[in-house]
């Protein structure tokens, strides 16, 4: 999103955004006595062209692979991946429709395509970048519903619902990109024919920055925060259930014996006895008994004889080996749960960290600069870095949302090896 602002300190459209440190063209021509560029300027243009060209090509290639993978691999054709595919299409539009003109503007450090193309460029820039950001919100919202209401959302998670979310992102994008073309801009925006800048009207600045970034940012932080809490709760709950199930399943198979309570101390009848109070938690199948917390040992007297068989229970000293095994299993299970929590934190951290890293500097400058253009100064090279940092999010999105997915990785390998068979 190419938001630029003019400053009284620099009449050549010093921007907060993609204007770079440039050598004055007239001075360059006078210094050489010809129309040739001075060496530093030529070197800058070559290096910048190569770097930005590589960024654009990588972004086109990466997002194209995501779209192709979803289109060709049936296993990837689900609602969650439809949103990722739509994000890839949006970022592909940024890479094809916006970035080439932005790169030309960056390299030449002046706008050479006329005012009408400038208006179209700004509108496409704001539309596509805003839609890309809002797609991230749609993906976060879909994941939030899926993890907090998994049973009911299975039926609600339909292609139609995905289409509604995608349509909303584009409608909001249009509502932010169109107003400047309808007159919501200041007179100074077109004062310099060599500059192509977004509307610097204060009202539009607040409207566009909050609609395109700050509100989506808050929404994503809330959603991913709740997703993390829900995921952590589910992981820990699963571990507790598994441990409880393991403990309750520790039964003693006693099918050969029959239990009879002692009847008036009759030593001939079959009996079971214990040294302490016995509290079995619940009976097991096939004549087995689950041990209780106070259970020490179980003495079995066969029905047809007086021979006794003593079976140690899990919490007796004789069964310490069973306890050790159980403790090791529990410890391993908890380590796995902790690893899953860390992976969840890492994944959410990468998603939010990349988004904030790419766009927050841009929108801070976009919001502040129009209100203090006469008093604020920012080096042109820094404005260029901030501008292209935002654009680079279109390159990083397919890496974060698709390339880390094993199913996508498999599809990408098939595409690259040209051994793809739809199945």
UniProtKB/Swiss-Prot annotation:
Biased composition (Polar residues): 316-329
GO cellular component terms, A-Z: plasma membrane
Phylogenetic lineage: Eukaryota, Metazoa, Chordata, Craniata, Vertebrata
Cytoplasmic side: 69-82, 142-161, 226-347, 405-423
GO aspect biological process, one term: regulation of vasoconstriction
Gene: htr1aa
Subcellular localization, as worded in the UniProt entry: Cell membrane
Main localization, broad class: membrane
Annotated stretches, region: Disordered: 311-332
Protein purpose: G-protein coupled receptor for 5-hydroxytryptamine (serotonin). Also functions as a receptor for various drugs and psychoactive substances. Ligand binding causes a conformation change that triggers signaling via guanine nucleotide-binding proteins (G proteins) and modulates the activity of downstream effectors, such as adenylate cyclase.
Span of the annotated motif DRY motif: 142-144
Any GO molecular function: G protein-coupled serotonin receptor activity
Residues binding 1D-myo-inositol 4-phosphate: 320, 346-347, 353, 404-406
Keyword line: Behavior, Cell membrane, Disulfide bond, G-protein coupled receptor, Glycoprotein, Membrane, Receptor, Transducer, Transmembrane, Transmembrane helix
Control of this protein's activity: G-protein coupled receptor activity is regulated by lipids: phosphatidylinositol 4-phosphate increases HTR1A-mediated activity.
The name this protein goes by in its record: 5-hydroxytryptamine receptor 1A-alpha
Pfam families found in the cross-reference section: 7tm_1 (PF00001)
Binding-site residues, serotonin: 125, 129
Membrane-topology annotation of the record: Multi-pass membrane protein
Spans within the Extracellular topological domain: 1-47, 108-116, 184-202, 372-379
Disulphide connectivity of cysteines: 118-196
Family: Belongs to the G-protein coupled receptor 1 family. 5-hydroxytryptamine receptor subfamily.
Motif NPxxY motif, residue range(s) on this chain: 397-401
Segments traversing the membrane: 48-68, 83-107, 117-141, 162-183, 203-225, 348-371, 380-404
